[in-house]
């Protein structure tokens, strides 16, 4: 946010907070467009890239249609929207929630902890001031998208998602695009050529997809997580006891959505977690996830043994009333599984998993998240918070991959999924971790089998352990593979993984690596229309439309910068070569020359054939006339 602000030197953060102008600039040659649905307030945002014309041989040009791409940046890249992080984003879903008439406004926060924070006057300079009263389902009600889907209701959120997944293309346009796309191999996925609102409803009703959208986060643009839709990417942000501030985390949020984060997890473990989260949610156009056990641990001064159900329950309500869209809950770490990790090379590497394992051993009791799971479901369905069932026993190195502890927990997560579904609570399953390439497919197969096709959400996996500083590369390989096999969402890894807290540039690097992985998975699955952007890039590359190449890229800034390092002049962006091969050895220029030469030969051949045909016809006419002049006789005396 334009530099770190010392909160001790200002009266209120709500008077000074601002977002970096770089984070709100539209992408080059791009504009925000909105596709309208069946009602005027269903306006689906996406990005449209303007392409330059193709120069033809005769000096004329041929227009190239603009390219639409999926956009997660929300209003931040729309110049028509005034951005003020002190007030938060427009509450786009509020009317839809009102129309359902199944919620009530509370008079204020009901969490004991939230109330205590509100009464603490020393926090006034940190508060997000423009708060709204939280909502909750009417007594005994259920407001989850899964509940509506199972009742046969197509919600505005579902319609929005169908338009968004299709990039507002008509069915005929997608069918036409599929003629220039490889069919792919989808390993049992069932994506139709054209996604309808009814298909979205069916997938949600079956539990194969989730729409994370807490009723207290109406600022979020509806999105879907499921293997029959585009593969999604999550970015982690959050402060720690060592570094970062509220304004830095909001800046990281905006930056992450700019570079393609479909969801963002706030993993804050430092000071002022409650206030930080409020600022993040109010300014987030994407769903926000958390790991509630982190904050619960802070409430008991970091002593895992002192955790209890009452503290955790209050934390769930606190975060649900703020608008958190999905909770990672490590309810599958059972007491009997903990000894299975003793022989591992790296033991338990999940923070949440280790916290619950320590609690279980200290009390010699079953995990209270497991024993109170149905009570957790009651809380979740009153706000439409989705489960992200945490893999607390995931492998922390490739030596521990696919072991007894990991798959025992996975089977328990499958059991918990069915309990959650009984309550109509949306559920996704978290996965590893560190897995070598030849063992990745087994993870996907086991998850589909035991978790009844609930969406899978994995951290990578990293396919080797020797890449510190480059873990976004090694995990991106695993992410692309498991996305192809059917994983619905990939949790990004940054270059700082295992090394430190990521900064803005690390967030971008991790996201670009994972957008590549997700897109590669879509291509490999043959997702309808996935190859449109690749084909547009290839055409621009062959025609030496350099500006279009930069603008179509996932990271236009870096593409342009790398080109300009060696060919900085504007005239070089019209050149039919780059610095890799130079003007004489450019394969595409040579190919164009070959094409031109072939076209010339064909023209000459056609001309020659035309001339020969003309001579033959003239000869035929002469012989015909000679026949007529001779009295039309077949034979003549010699």
From Swiss-Prot:
Q: Tell me which UniProt keywords the record has, alphabetically.
A: 4Fe-4S, Iron, Iron-sulfur, Lyase, Metal-binding, S-adenosyl-L-methionine, Thiamine biosynthesis, Zinc
- Ranges of Low complexity composition bias in the record: 608-624
What residues bind [4Fe-4S] cluster, as annotated? 578, 581, 586
User: Which GO terms label this protein's molecular function in UniProt?
Assistant: 4 iron, 4 sulfur cluster binding; carbon-carbon lyase activity; zinc ion binding
Q: What cofactor(s) does the depicted protein rely on?
A: [4Fe-4S] cluster
Binding annotation for Zn(2+) = 434, 498
Q: Which InterPro entries match?
A: ThiC, ThiC-associated_dom, ThiC/Bza_core_dom, ThiC/BzaA/B
Q: Where does substrate bind?
A: 236, 265, 294, 330, 350-352, 391-394, 430, 457
Give a GO cellular-component term: cytosol
Q: Which GO terms describe its biological process?
A: thiamine biosynthetic process; thiamine diphosphate biosynthetic process
Q: Which PANTHER family has this protein been placed in?
A: PHOSPHOMETHYLPYRIMIDINE SYNTHASE, CHLOROPLASTIC, THIAMINE BIOSYNTHESIS PROTEIN THIC
Subunit structure of this chain's protein: Homodimer.
* Family the UniProt entry places it in: Belongs to the ThiC family.
Q: What is this protein called?
A: Phosphomethylpyrimidine synthase
- What is the primary gene name for this protein? thiC
